[in-house]
Amino acid sequence: MVLMDSVVIGGGAWGTAIANLLAFNTQRVTIFCRNTTVIDSINKRHINTKYLPTFPLNKNISATSRMDVLKNAELIFVAVPSQSMRELLQKVKENIKESVQIILCNKGIERESLLLMSEVVHEELPKNDIFVLSGPNFAHEVLSKKPSFSNLAGRNKTSYDKIANALSTETFFTKYITDINGTQILGAFKNVIAIICGLLVRMDAGSNTLSALMSLALEEARSFITIKNGNPDTIMEFCGIGDLVLTCFSNKSRNFRYGYRLVDGYSENALVEGKSTLESLHELARIHNINCVLTNTLYTVTQFNSYGTSSFEQDIKRELNSAFMSLLGCAKNP
């Protein structure tokens, strides 16, 4: 066991799963969050009753809402919604040492600035080493000790080794890559494609259509990676095709479920990362004058006046059909 203190910011399912991994390898693990129910249940019962009520946690995990817990941390993992990232950092940054590695476990793009999460962190904590953890992982499977794989993207191999030693177990594996930007844009983009997959499954589009969508999505992903100066080869990593498949073909994915229920008038204000990410990616494509057909089509669908009405499904079908024809460069059969 490594003699170091680790802090996970965020007491949701993924943050809790990460804390439990760290607890196998590090001396003390603290979850920093605001929810008193989560804090009390972890400290008193060693369980997160709000998000993961059936999974007992390692007993060297504690939880607190006190910011000063960050002062002694050697590793800080951040697992909070992307749109609250900057506000959080501004509140806690005075408690974070410059020598601490920051590991981002969230996926998204800041809506106002169109910055990736690592870019937001760099603005607020310019001296800290930043890593991104991303891969095809559901929290409950990680906690169930099912073999799981992630990329850990960063630009300092020595720091990677330190983080990997703290995080890796017999069933959780990390692979080092240096493409921080590509890793993040793929993590954001796959949420948009998952919404489209949910729509298509709800409309009984079939396996042929869904498989073709994956090919088209990978091409569109290249465009966004280029915008953010990433490496297109990252598409073939766990954080790329691996995460895309997991998120797009499982009804456990919140974004897939959102797309599935969207046809029936599910609230467009639903708290899914794909919703805000969609708006950000649409704006990025517009600014850089790149025709990202899938992203733009889904954005158009969410703006329909027919939203929640009986004609909404037909409007969706028309837009998706038009998008596929456009991507294939062919005209609709008479």
Curated annotation (Swiss-Prot):
Residue positions of the active site: K190
Report residues binding NADPH.
Answer: W14, R34, K107, A139, R254, V272, E273
Q: Which UniProt keywords apply?
A: Cytoplasm, Lipid biosynthesis, Lipid metabolism, NAD, NADP, Nucleotide-binding, Oxidoreductase, Phospholipid biosynthesis, Phospholipid metabolism
Say yes or no: keyword Repeat present: no
Gene Ontology cellular-component annotations: cytosol
Annotated family: Belongs to the NAD-dependent glycerol-3-phosphate dehydrogenase family.
Its name, as the record gives it, is Glycerol-3-phosphate dehydrogenase [NAD(P)+]
Origin species, per record, is Neorickettsia sennetsu (strain ATCC VR-367 / Miyayama)
